Amino acid sequence: MNYIPDWNEELAKKIAKSEFINMTPDHWEIIYIIRNFYLNFNLAPSIRILIKTLEKMKYNKKKCSSRYLLKLFPKNPIKQASKIAGVPKTNDCI
């Protein structure tokens, strides 16, 4: 998927529905973190970098784990979250 410049929450909800994900405030937190990361660095974060970013943002320790992210995005946290966020998926080499 390419970056979607005219991304909005309605589009994100449609994409999430196609991924069988019911968006909650926890999902939106991750989506906006990924979008902000992409806008700052022109790439989506790997799962490792996303977890480090959550830690730096002083998130609850429970939320700073791949297990938590898998509960939100069960197929593949980065792939699904990036798709919903309208940003290209990282190649996970970082």
From Swiss-Prot:
Any GO MF annotation of the entry: transferase activity
This protein's GO CC annotations: cytoplasm
Active-site residues, record numbering mapped to chain: 93
Compartment(s) of residence: Cytoplasm
Root EC class: transferase
GO terms classed as biological process: tRNA wobble position uridine thiolation
Superkingdom field: Bacteria
Keywords: Cytoplasm, Transferase, tRNA processing
EC number(s) per entry: 2.8.1.-
Primary residence: cytoplasm
Family: Belongs to the DsrC/TusE family.
Primary role: Part of a sulfur-relay system required for 2-thiolation of 5-methylaminomethyl-2-thiouridine (mnm(5)s(2)U) at tRNA wobble positions. Could accept sulfur from TusD.
PANTHER family linked: SULFURTRANSFERASE TUSE
Subunit structure, interactors included: Interacts with the TusBCD complex. Interacts with MnmA.
Name of the protein in question: Sulfurtransferase TusE
Gene field: tusE
